[in-house]
């Protein structure tokens, strides 16, 4: 039985296979995090320098390094988040493991066809 393709997987040149999508997810997370972190780092430095009224030469050195540090740090966190949210292509797993569906049916049929009854009357007693 063939599985339907996911939406957007028709054109492999644009999206690529599942591994490429995972790498793209990590890259996109890193870039978004780097942009947000650099902006946040710049805002913090600008507020700090406005409050202390320091010279502009020190501002330029500190602004660049702070933006790079905050952008890199937050970009790494967002890249890790993109890696954690990476989807696994289930069609490849099911093709490799043909007994996967069979095992699930066996487990469900065991529970549905079980003729054992449990005596739960001792649990119904309420004590106040």
Curated annotation (Swiss-Prot):
Q: Name one GO cellular component term.
A: mitochondrion
Q: Any transmembrane segments, and where?
A: 30-50
Biological process (GO) annotations held by this record are: protein import into mitochondrial matrix; protein insertion into mitochondrial inner membrane
InterPro entries given in the database record = Romo1/Mgr2
Location within or outside the cell: Mitochondrion membrane
Q: What UniProt keywords apply to this chain's record, in alphabetical order?
A: Membrane, Mitochondrion, Transmembrane, Transmembrane helix
Q: How does it sit in the membrane?
A: Single-pass membrane protein
- Source superkingdom: Eukaryota
Entry-linked SMART domains: Romo1
Instruction: Give the primary localization class.
Output: mitochondrion
The similarity annotation says: Belongs to the MGR2 family.
Please identify the protein, giving its name as recorded: Reactive oxygen species modulator 1 homolog
